[in-house]
Amino acid sequence: MSVKVEVIEGGVPHQKIMIAGLVATIVCLYLSYLNVYTNTAYFSFFGGLAVVAALIWGSNTIKVLCSYGIGTGVPSAGMIAFGSGVIAMLLATKFGIAAPIVALVLAAVIGLILGYLSNEVLNMKIPVMIQSLTELAVVGALTLMGFAVLITGSFTFTGLTTGSVTLFGMISMPSYQVSFIGGGLVAVAFLLGSIAVQHPFNACLGPGWKQDRMLMLTAECGFLSMIVAAVMSFALVSMIAGIISLLIALIGWVYTYTQYIELSKRDAAAWLDSKPIPDVEGH
């Protein structure tokens, strides 16, 4: 049996956030396909923006799910989102330009199955469990695909598994180790996303919870993760493409961080300018 914690209700309805997050994520992923038409990686930053949009949606989904009193389930929700999402993302990359849509469908099916097992087999009996795990699986899959685009410039299987090394500055040879999957970057993306999606609600929950503050923190965590991914992208895309992604990530992070601090000041009972602990001699 579960009890819903009504104190955290309010703000923008979850359905609106879900629709906006899904549409924004899919649009950004497809805008990154401009890399193919221009034969560059300059539009890889759209993958990072897709990550931020998906994380905002996922963070609010975790809030809805964990409103039923499963506090320790917040980190677990982030992990199951990406654990199920990575399966859908990897399978979907074999479908070329249709990969984002295929990832969405596959992840939804996986999440639906996990939600059913959680409620009916594990007997958790949480009313929103099936819908929430379905959403989180989709969020995990699309977030990982966004990181893949940001780091490699592509969301196709070939782009994620094949890199190249240059010998003597002249001869370029394919190398599967220098790639998103072969180089283990998918594991880093997994952790960046799973932490970013579950941390904001954990940090903002309580009687003073406000939706706008939590979602602003989510965006800040998203851009912070984008900075890390943009730095990693220098190994796989051109320097110009990496710099573009890094600059956009830095601008987004500075803006969202300052906004989050302002919202924290707004909601705090008091904001004290504490001083360093004095170093008293003889103690």
Predicted segments, located by residue:
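Hydrophobic, membrane-facing alpha-helical anchors
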Residues: 1-6, 47-65
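Generic alpha-helical transmembrane segments
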Residues: 46-56, 106-116, 177-199
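Alpha-helical membrane-embedded segments
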Residues: 109-113, 183-193, 227, 237-261
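Short, highly charged, low-complexity non-transmembrane loops/tails of multi-pass membrane proteins
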Residues: 212, 262-283
